[in-house]
Amino acid sequence: IAIVVHPNYLEKVEELCCINNFKKVGRILQGGSERYYSSLSAINAYASTENDINLIFHDSVRPLVTKRIISDCITMLGKYGAVDVAIPATDTIIKMNLNTHEIEDIPNRQFLYNGQTPQAFKLSVIREAYKRALVDPNFKTTDDCGVVLKYMPDIPIGVVPGEKFNMKLTHKEDLFLLDNLFQLKSVSDVSLYGQENALEHKVIVIFGGSYGIGHS
């Protein structure tokens, strides 16, 4: 795992990884002012790798991503050079004229999906896509799959079904929703796997008890 962070938080993230003994974190990389700078930082960090490895990009603002989604992305990379995660759009999407604030079009919702992360790629694919993008003076992007779609249109992009729980933390009220979803997920894990498995590798702290543990 490589964590790409803002330069101001490099030391803090290193400290957290050390204190919590996050052994899976192999690299902590410096990001930039634009989202794609972070992607490029990760791509360049593995550029010297001899094999065409799989790279999986995930936004930290989606903390409830599941093992199933990640596993499905890895599996689909066996067939595709690029993979996205998405769920069907449930709201009607309108195209609005920003000058007049009038509806210009209402696309067929049957073909519309809400994109999520992670997004997964063969290293050779995403590296070449950004190589082409960076020589385009009009290059703009907020999405890595969008870079592949625009600059390597011959590369098909597979789609893995996402989950509603894999929501993005964008606004303050999202913190409340995510906190409740996390608690609900924790309860579900106990019901599904049993208390013993759910508590494995966890630290239990007991508060209260006037006379201490073991008092008869």
Kindly give the residue locations of the regions a language model identified.
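A short, basic/flexible loop-to-alpha-helix module at the beginning of a structural domain
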Residues: S186-H201
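Short, structured interface segments
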Residues: K168-S188
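Short beta-strand-to-loop acidic/aromatic patch adjacent to the donor-nucleotide binding site
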Residues: E50-V61
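Conserved core of the sugar-phosphate nucleotidyltransferase
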Residues: L64-G158
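Residue-level signal for inorganic ion chemistry
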Residues: A42, D59, P88, K122, ...
